[in-house]
Amino acid sequence: MDNMDESVEPVDNPKPNGEEYHVERQIGFLLRQANQRHVAIFAGMMGDRLTTTQWAALSKLREIQPSSQNQLGRETAMDVATIKGVVDRLVARGLVQTEADPKDGRRLVLCLTDEGQSTIARNIEAAVTVTDETLSPLTSAERMMLLELLKKIC
């Protein structure tokens, strides 16, 4: 137990027989609860019937467009099937379009439509507020620490 305060019990240290395992102390359980809180706040504040994954794809595409679907998936931490479904829905809604890749006309790339750009503009302030509200129980220092720790394990 080098450099560890002995009064702090490790989060996941079940006994071999499992009798000290408590799901509410497990990282997966806590991350799921935090995500549920975030999704509920997001749904209540964001407009345009956007999901968290659609918003992630739109806002990242704004930064990196034009982009292949695979690149957008990597940039938003979505697997191939998930990003395909998200992009298909965004295309169907007229927020994203495909175009010939200017570097290789045989490939298609994704770009925001004017409506996609407008959707981002209408919702960007709400997105910032969603993050602030999600993290509202934390101090500024705790927010920074949480974000750094999450980046470290991702």
Predicted regions and their residues:
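Generic alpha-helical hydrophobic packing signal
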Residues: 26, 53, 57-66, 70-73, ...
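Conserved alpha-helix in the HATPase_c
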Residues: 85
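N-terminal leader segment of winged-helix/HTH proteins
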Residues: 1-48, 93-95, 112
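N-terminal helix-turn-helix DNA-binding core of bacterial DNA-binding proteins
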Residues: 20-22, 29-32, 36-82
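Generic N-terminal leader/processing signal
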Residues: 1, 13, 81-82, 141
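Intrinsically disordered, low-complexity regions of eukaryotic proteins
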Residues: 4-7, 81, 106
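Charged, amphipathic alpha-helical coiled-coil/dimerization segments
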Residues: 39, 88-151
